[in-house]
Structures are given as C-alpha cells and as structure tokens.
Swiss-Prot record:
Iron-sulfur as UniProt keyword: no
Protein name: Mannose-P-dolichol utilization defect 1 protein homolog
Family, as annotated: Belongs to the MPDU1 (TC 2.A.43.3) family.
Residues that span the membrane, as ranges: 40-60, 68-88, 98-118, 120-140, 148-168, 180-200, 207-227
Domain PQ-loop: 37-95, 152-202
Keyword check for Cell membrane: no
Signal peptide start and end residues: none
Keywords assigned by UniProt, alphabetized: Membrane, Repeat, Transmembrane, Transmembrane helix, Transport
Organism: Caenorhabditis elegans
Compartments, as annotated in UniProt: Membrane
Gene behind the chain: mpdu-1
GO CC annotations, alphabetized: membrane
Protein origin, superkingdom: Eukaryota
Biological process according to GO: IRE1-mediated unfolded protein response; oligosaccharide biosynthetic process
Length: 242
C-alpha cells in the first residue's frame, strides 16, 4: 500500500517537489510549482477524457444515426490518437501526459463502430475491430518498431489537420453541426489547450507540442461552428420531429 502511495506522490510531485512544496513550503521554487501544476492538469485531463466522447456516443445511440459526422474525420482522428498514445507509451512518458490520447482512442473506436453499424456495414465494423486489435498488440509487444511509431506521430500533425478540416468542411456544407455533441467538442477544445502546456512542461517534445497546438486551433473552429450554425441546426431538428 505504501508503495502505491509513494508512486502516486511521485507521479504528482516529480523529483523533490513534495518536500519543497509541502514540507519546506517553498512555493517560490524555480521549477516545482509549474511541474506540479502540469502533472495535476495532466491527471485532470486524463480523468476527463474517460468521459470525453460519452455525450457523443449517447447522442448517436439515441438517434440511431451518425448523420453529420464524417467517418473519414473520425478514422483520421483515431490514427492521430493511437499514434500519440503509442509513441508516448514507448517513449516512457508519464501516463498523465498521454493517458487522454489512450481513452480518446477507445471512444473513437466506439464511435466509428456506431457509424459502420448504423449505416448497415456490419462486416466493415468486424474488420475494423480486428485491425485495431492487431495494432494494439503490436505496440504493447514491441512488434511495431519505434521508428514506425515516430513516423506515425510525425504524420499525426497533417493527419490532425486533415481530420479536423474534413469535419469543418462537412459542417460548412450542411450549415449544421448535425449529431456532433457540443459538450464533447468543447471538452476536446479545452483539453488540447491544456495539453499544450503539459507537453511543454512534462516532455518538451516538439512533435507533441506542435500536434496539440494545431489540434487546439482546429477544435476551436469546430466549437465556433456550433454558434455560427445554431439556428440552422435547431430548425433542422424541428423539421425532423415534425
């Protein structure tokens, strides 16, 4: 039990920060306050990400439809999330720095399965699940080399851009955000903004910093579209009810 508590303390208070801040009350330490804030933010983002897409999943399930949600956008977002989680896991970064990517990937898998199933593509959903399982095994067993994961993470930046632009474009053409969940999109936007700070503080890895910065800007645009097309989405919903 004491080992578990020690691991938790070390996760939140790197180095000698526990002693500096909570024993010596050295709140003006040059690095510890920022380091602990970053770790705390990281854990908060990771915990929040467990439910990030639950509103979206429930909305699709209730409507029995994924209308307005770009399958290509979700697939590319999944590649980006898996790339970040796999690269960070194999690089040995603390879980609080990438755990959200893992949980986001799991939820994106569910959303993509919903898109396939509600469009009658059952066999496609089975094949998709098989591919995801094989990739997960390859990462954990180290069958996939680190060079490949680095390449995927590097490619993740344009992948994120294309993924978000596809959804932005679909919203623009429809003048509506369809079945997109406002709560999920807002949490994505806030989470990627916070991740820019935690990536700078915890890893200093430019691949992650640029990736999260790009995602934050594009998530902000999608969030703004809810307010731009609010009246269109409301009128479309009323027509469907009538």
């Amino acid at each position: 039990m004491s080992k578990i508590m020690n691991d938790i303390i070390q996760s939140l208070f790197p180095g000698n920060c526990f002693e500096e801040l909570l024993i010596n009350f050295n709140f003006f330490h040059p690095t510890c306050p920022k380091a602990v804030l970053s770790r705390g933010l990281g854990f908060a983002i990771t915990l929040g990400s467990i439910l990030l897409f639950v509103p979206q999943i429930l909305k699709i399930q209730a409507a029995r439809s994924a209308q307005g949600i770009s399958a290509a956008s979700q697939l590319l977002a999944l590649v980006g999330a898996i790339g970040t989680a796999s690269y960070s896991y194999r690089s040995g970064f603390v879980f609080s720095g990438w755990g959200d990517s893992f949980f986001v990937a799991v939820q994106l898998v569910i959303i993509i399965l919903q898109i396939f199933l509600f469009s009658g593509q059952t066999m496609l959903s089975v094949g998709f699940l098989g591919i995801v399982s094989a990739v997960a095994y390859g990462v954990v067993s180290k069958s996939i080399p680190m060079q490949t994961l680095t390449a995927v993470q590097t490619a993740g930046i344009p992948i994120v851009v294309v993924s978000k632009l596809l959804q932005i474009s679909q919203n623009y053409r429809a003048q509506s955000t369809g079945q997109l969940s406002l709560i999920s999109v807002f949490l994505q936007f806030a989470g990627t903004l916070a991740r820019v700070f935690t990536s700078v503080q915890d890893t200093g890895d430019m691949l992650l910093i640029v990736s999260y910065s790009t995602a934050a800007v594009l998530n902000g645009l999608i969030f703004a579209q809810f307010f731009m097309y609010w009246s269109h989405s409301e009128s479309a919903a009323k027509k469907k009810r009538n």
